[in-house]
């Protein structure tokens, strides 16, 4: 009888709603300051719609409050993501209504504050974000290859994706924090269907990520309307297409599967979602909080205005723009880029020569970013055309690899992050392990530096062996042997970018079978390819602030003073005619420039 009584007194298990409330309370206590919680409550109170005395947020309300531009068409995508994450950790209950507790959970997860509560081995939210954007439709995810010989491989890939989506570590960590055992039924609920992010939906979301990338705390998405109008909008779409191409081949599949999603982010876009933190932290700053209010009878001065924001890109270039800057921030720290870049060299303005490049760039004593864009050379007509193209083709090894993509006369954009000051190279290259070779257009890709092969960067002036001059990344430096000096063929590295000395042509090589040289092979394009292109523009941007720019200006000023002093040599006589006669005797001026005699 005692056993029966003890069983009757055992508390009933908590419902999903009660567990969600408990998790929200844990997050609120551990992840927010009292002021942030107060602000969130005030914001929610001002935005919430009510039904039966229950407040919640609608799609349009969230988009309007966050200043999401209508032109992107991303509001439904954002709302789907938020209502899915609001059901955390019971994701099978999604979509959830967006009450105050649900918004606490959403903001905690989207701003990475959950790391303060959940165990460290569950720090990655990539799987959660994928699920929040995905659709679960077997028909959508079935590729055309399933109808032919690719059926087995497609099924194996789908099985791998299902296995990868099982046992979400973040969900398990949340249940651990609650002291709750996750049922097997819930654990495998969403893995029973094919999960895929449709390409069009993901394109819109990438455009939003590009837009929010430079946001500061309390920053507004509408602070720069030029980014979503005219040329700015076109640049945003171009960058989004290049990034989407890394995830998806639309000719083969209509959407992005999880294994591809996680692989591309880990290898090429490690900071892709960082802009979501300031975006969702915007809920934590209430405009009703006025710290400028004084005592009784005083109020905030009506003449006080917020200081104008500094533009994220101070200078302009033919390659660099705000969207390219955001794209690079997905693999380079934002504190190196936003409001920190200065245009050091632009071929369009300074001339396409290594001399101009050296004069403008070599005095910058901080990291730099080189960008080069051009148009792909067509194999036949360009090879046999007039001009310098045939000479360029003759200087390269015979083509062994196909092009990286199928577009004719397609625009190509490559870049290199150079972590140390530039210098002339003779037998040894410079750069180091932090050097990054990357492609921005028409596909986003990354090639990180090797720690074993040191042939990272070479800057060789034109000499008696002109075919070996130029700027190269990943190519072996010139050898001292006579056979090498006599050779007219440039030695290309397995993964390399080469620009000729006139900055007229370039060549990018990706020898996947070699497994890389000074740079590792691509993690997302596991095949050989080569791009030969006519250069349209070259730019070098300095990473740094006012101190670096001041140091460079001082070096330039010193060189200008020295050059002027050498030009104005005072011969000491004060007699112009006598000085001229002396210079004529020395053979330095006049018609008899034969020099003087020591006899």
UniProtKB/Swiss-Prot annotation:
May be involved in a process influencing telomere capping. One of its GO terms (cellular component) is cytoplasm. Keywords: Cytoplasm. It comes from Neurospora crassa (strain ATCC 24698 / 74-OR23-1A / CBS 708.71 / DSM 1257 / FGSC 987). Pfam families: TLD. It is found in: Cytoplasm. PROSITE patterns: TLDC. Belongs to the RTC5 family. Residues 318-544 form the TLDc domain. One of its GO terms (biological process) is response to oxidative stress. The lineage of its organism: Eukaryota, Fungi, Dikarya, Ascomycota, Pezizomycotina. This is Restriction of telomere capping protein 5. InterPro entries: TLDc_dom.
């Amino acid at each position: 009888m005692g056993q029966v009584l003890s069983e009757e007194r055992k508390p009933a298990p908590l419902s999903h709603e009660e567990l969600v409330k408990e998790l929200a309370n844990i997050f609120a206590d551990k992840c927010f300051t009292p002021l942030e919680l107060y602000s969130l409550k005030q914001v929610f109170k001002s935005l919430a719609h009510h039904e039966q005395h229950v407040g919640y947020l609608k799609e349009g309300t969230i988009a309007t409050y966050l200043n999401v531009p209508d032109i992107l068409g991303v509001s439904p995508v954002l709302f789907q993501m938020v209502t899915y994450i609001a059901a955390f950790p019971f994701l099978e209950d999604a979509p959830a209504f967006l009450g105050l507790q649900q918004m606490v959970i959403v903001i905690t997860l989207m701003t990475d504050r959950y790391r303060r509560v959940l165990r460290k081995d569950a720090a990655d939210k990539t799987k959660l974000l994928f699920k929040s954007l995905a659709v679960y439709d077997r028909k959508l995810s079935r590729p055309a290859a399933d109808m032919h010989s690719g059926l087995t491989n497609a099924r194996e890939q789908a099985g791998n994706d299902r296995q990868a989506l099982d046992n979400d570590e973040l969900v398990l960590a949340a249940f651990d924090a609650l002291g709750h055992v996750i049922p097997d039924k819930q654990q495998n609920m969403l893995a029973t269907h094919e999960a895929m992010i449709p390409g069009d939906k993901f394109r819109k979301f990438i455009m939003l990520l590009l837009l929010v990338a430079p946001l500061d705390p309390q920053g507004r998405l509408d602070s720069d309307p030029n980014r979503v109008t005219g040329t700015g909008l076109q640049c945003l779409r171009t960058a989004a297409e290049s990034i989407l191409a890394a995830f998806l081949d639309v000719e083969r599949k209509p959407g992005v599967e999880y294994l591809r999603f996680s692989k591309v982010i880990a290898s090429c876009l490690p900071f892709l979602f960082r802009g979501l933190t300031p975006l969702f932290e915007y809920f934590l700053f209430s405009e009703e909080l006025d710290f400028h209010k004084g005592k009784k009878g005083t109020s905030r001065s009506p003449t006080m205005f917020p200081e104008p924001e500094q533009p994220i890109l101070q200078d302009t270039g033919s390659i660099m723009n705000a969207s390219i800057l955001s794209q690079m921030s997905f693999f380079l720290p934002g504190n190196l880029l936003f409001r920190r870049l200065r245009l050091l060299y632009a071929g369009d303005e300074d001339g396409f020569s290594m001399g101009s490049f050296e004069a403008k760039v070599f005095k910058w004593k901080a990291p730099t970013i080189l960008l080069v864009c051009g148009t792909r050379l067509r194999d036949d007509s360009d090879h046999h055309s007039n001009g310098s193209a045939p000479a360029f083709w003759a200087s390269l090894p015979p083509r062994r690899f196909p092009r990286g993509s199928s577009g004719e006369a397609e625009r190509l954009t490559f870049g290199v992050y150079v972590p140390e000051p530039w210098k002339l190279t003779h037998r040894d290259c410079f750069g180091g392990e932090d050097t990054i070779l990357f492609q921005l257009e028409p596909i986003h890709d990354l090639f990180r530096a090797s720690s074993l092969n040191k042939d990272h960067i070479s800057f060789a002036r034109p000499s008696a062996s002109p075919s070996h001059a130029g700027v190269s990344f990943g190519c072996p430096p010139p050898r001292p042997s006579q056979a090498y000096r006599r050779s007219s063929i440039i030695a290309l590295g397995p993964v390399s970018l080469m620009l000729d000395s006139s900055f007229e042509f370039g060549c990018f090589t990706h020898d996947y079978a070699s497994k890389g040289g000074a740079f590792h092979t691509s993690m997302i394009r596991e095949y050989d390819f080569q791009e030969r292109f006519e250069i349209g523009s070259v730019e070098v941007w300095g990473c740094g602030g006012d101190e670096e720019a001041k140091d460079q200006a001082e070096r330039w000023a010193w060189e200008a003073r020295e050059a002027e002093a050498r030009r104005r040599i005072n011969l000491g006589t004060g007699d112009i005619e006598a000085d001229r006669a002396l210079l004529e005797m020395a053979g330095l001026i006049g018609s008899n420039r034969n020099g003087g005699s020591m006899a």
